[in-house]
Regions:
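Helix-start (N-cap) detector for alpha-helical repeat units in TPR-like alpha-solenoids
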Residues: 39, 92, 126-127, 160-161, ...
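Amphipathic alpha-helical scaffolding segments comprising HEAT/armadillo-like alpha-solenoid repeats
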Residues: 23-33, 54-65, 89-96, 147
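Terminal, low-structured helical/coil segments at or just beyond the last alpha-helical repeat
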Residues: 98-101, 180-215
Length: 215
């Protein structure tokens, strides 16, 4: 009797595990749902890929930034940042999060020092450069910020955050033509940035007026 009960219990446990595995979507399934699913399925896939996705999911999430569904677009952007913030090394990830917290606390010198550790520890990791670029920008060190933005883009050409960062740096340096170029590139990838779009419109208007005044 005890043996039969044990076998029955084992069979039940295996059935539960099998059912749970069947309910857990694979990355491939999520990508397919993101591309071809209903609005609700695309929303779910766009959100879950932030936790389950890796670099292979990035092109599909980039495409989802232009989805007809606003929620899908927002979740896709959130998932992109989640993936981009993961280096594959827990220690580097922790250092990055410390650097981000220091930026948010306006402790910029400390943030730069912390993000130096990220860049030295993971020189191929784009987000280390991008976050340090943000700290440099907020500290008014625009040339250093530009260097880091460019480093991030070399490692991740679709990084709309680093592209818009170049736009803001060149804007601060009084180079509107370059700023416009990078704002447009950022919006080509991620059109869901009203602040960048507004800045771009104002820049183009000011540049047009400057040309008219020079005639």
């Amino acid at each position: 009797m005890r043996g039969r009960t044990a076998w029955a219990l084992l069979a039940l446990v295996l059935a539960i595990i099998s059912a749970a595995q069947a309910q857990t979507p694979t990355r491939e399934t999520l990508v397919q749902k993101l591309q071809e699913g209903t609005s609700e399925e695309r929303q779910h896939a766009a959100g879950v890929l932030g936790d389950m996705g890796d670099d292979s999911a990035v092109p599909h999430l980039i495409d989802a930034l232009k989805d007809d569904d606003e929620v899908v677009r927002e979740l896709a952007e959130h998932s992109l940042w989640a993936i981009w913030n993961r280096s594959g090394d827990p220690q580097i990830n922790a250092l990055l999060q410390e650097g981000i917290h220091l930026i948010q606390s306006d402790r910029l010198d400390e943030a730069i020092t912390k993000l130096d550790e990220v860049v030295k520890g993971a020189p191929g990791f784009p987000e280390g450069y991008n976050r340090r670029a943000t700290a440099y920008y907020l500290a008014g060190q625009y040339e250093k910020s530009i260097t880091d933005c460019e480093a991030a883009i070399r490692r991740n050409p679709m990084h709309f955050g680093a592209l818009s960062g170049l736009g803001y740096n060149y804007f601060k340096l009084g180079k509107p033509e370059r700023a416009i170029r990078y704002f447009e590139r950022a919006l080509d990838i991620n059109p869901n940035k009203p602040r960048i779009r507004s800045t771009l419109i104002e820049l183009k208007r000011a540049l047009h007026q400057r040309v008219r005044d020079s005639i």
